[in-house]
Amino acid sequence: MGGHSDVVGGALIVGDQALGEELAYHQNAMGAVAGPFDSWLVLRGTKTLSVRMDRHSENATKVADMLTRHARVTRVLYPGLPEHPGHEIAAKQMKAFGGMVSFQVEGGEEAAVEVCNRAKVFTLGESLGGVESLIEHPGRMTHASAAGSALEVPADLVRLSVGIENVDDLLQDLQQALG
């Protein structure tokens, strides 16, 4: 929501009033509320949320499309693609398809890590939804603790949080990173 990678927060939205009241009670009892500065950061971000989300989605759609045609990419995961298993649900629930794109690269784990290391416009990082584009290798970063479990991600997976930069810069960066 903040959009500037400088605050962590969240929301629980439920359709059941009794559950909402129970959650509010527990939140109040635990003191799990945002501080004034964090609240201000989120409020600041909400002022540009709509235009940021439009640009995230627009850029991510173009990135996903380019990746589907790249010879070194074996699979692209983006709900905006008709072949994505969740596409129909996403199309019903969402105005656009967001800025998160994952893809699998030919050559396994080392090739995926190399793509991350070669990126210049995409910054290596473990956040999402900010104005800047980020790239990560989840198997070694956010999901490293899941190795060997049912939650393990494919070793050749690269995850992108597509930002609001000029899309041509993003596409060129991924082209050169993929080699």
Q: What does each of the following model-derived ranges do?
A:
Residues 1-100, 104-137, 153:
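Active-site C-terminal subdomain of aminotransferase-like
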